[in-house]
Amino acid sequence: MTTAVGTPGSAITQRVHSLNRPNMVSVGTIIWLSSELMFFAGLFAMYFVARAQAHGNWPPEPTELNLALAVPVTAVLIASSFTCQMGVFAAERGDVFGLRRWYTITLLMGTFFVLGQGYEYYHLAHEGTTIAGSSYGSVFYITTGFHGLHVIGGLIAFVYLLVRTTLSKFTPAQATAAIVVSYYWHFVDIVWIGLFATIYFVS
């Protein structure tokens, strides 16, 4: 009679193998993100149409975008993609402590981005740039606002995942959830790079 004795190393290997195989959750997430991509494509189209129909300066006075704020805030959001991916690598190894550490850092960086965007909104509104004041104000707040809501959605997902992995035993299902959240976060970051380049650099 033989007895199979599992080792932590073999368990982790099996876990990683199962995570690397396609599953319905990951495929469904990718399909959903494709629809989100179409949504943001519509927002980009709206922005360019408004700009093409505008007369005079773009953005119009008194709007002055704070590039000195937008650059570091954007850099932090881009860097958060790397910390998020480090969390994914930890999840694939079965390292729940590493996952929590990297996802907590990502959560803080994403929060910094949202606060930075809110700070810019406050100053633009104080200067007279409002959503109803001009076509520029409308497309600026709508495009960046919807993106900001998506970022907040990602932050909620990070909080949920951190709480879930803290209150219960770490499982392959939780690792898959961490990977799915990373797909969403990378998507949000890529969209912002496009928005940032369009709004702040394309004249």
What role is predicted for each listed range?
Residues 1-203:
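...captures the hydrophobic TM-helix bundle architecture rather than a specific catalytic motif
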